[in-house]
């Protein structure tokens, strides 16, 4: 679950949070984190975004763990991950969405070994061949 403290956020940041919810709710692909629900907690003044849980964390932590133990990823694993990342990106691009913050910390690994792209709060929608920040609320 992602918690966004709404108090003190700029209007732009609030719109960005709402945009992430709108984008996530419209996506359905095996390599994109699933959106579950969102709710506003009046007590804590936070917007709570419930997303699919990736049991094996993110790729950034896997890389750090391997470096710590001087382990290497198998080439086959790297290729499988690359293909899954590209399939997720293709799906986003086919839907005129650019991730804009693709990094190991935003690529998650499920318990069955599937990679999923997440954290789309800086995503933008491409319109008429030009990328524009999406600020509307659906």
Regions found by a protein language model. Give the residues of each.
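Regulatory activation segment
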Residues: 115, 127-138
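A short, aromatic-enriched beta-strand patch in the conserved N-lobe beta-sheet
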Residues: 37-39
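Conserved N-lobe beta3->alphaC-helix segment of eukaryotic protein kinase catalytic domains
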Residues: 3-27
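AlphaC helix of the protein kinase catalytic domain
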Residues: 60-72
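Conserved short submotifs of the Hanks-type protein kinase catalytic core
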Residues: 44-58
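Activation segment signature within eukaryotic-like protein kinase domains
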Residues: 81-82
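Catalytic-loop of the protein kinase fold
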Residues: 93-109
């Amino acid at each position: 679950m992602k918690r966004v403290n709404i108090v003190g956020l700029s209007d732009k940041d609030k719109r960005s949070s709402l945009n992430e919810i709108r984008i996530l709710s419209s996506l359905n692909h095996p390599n994109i984190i699933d959106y579950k629900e969102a709710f506003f907690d009046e007590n804590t003044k936070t917007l709570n975004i419930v997303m699919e849980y990736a049991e094996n964390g993110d790729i950034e932590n896997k890389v750090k763990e391997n470096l710590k133990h001087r382990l290497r990823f198998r080439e086959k694993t790297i290729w499988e991950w690359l293909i899954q990342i590209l399939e997720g990106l293709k799906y986003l691009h086919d839907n005129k969405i650019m991730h804009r913050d693709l990094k190991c910390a935003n690529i998650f690994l499920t318990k069955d070994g599937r990679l999923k792209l997440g954290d789309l709060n800086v995503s933008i929608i491409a319109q008429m061949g030009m990328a524009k920040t999406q600020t509307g609320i659906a």
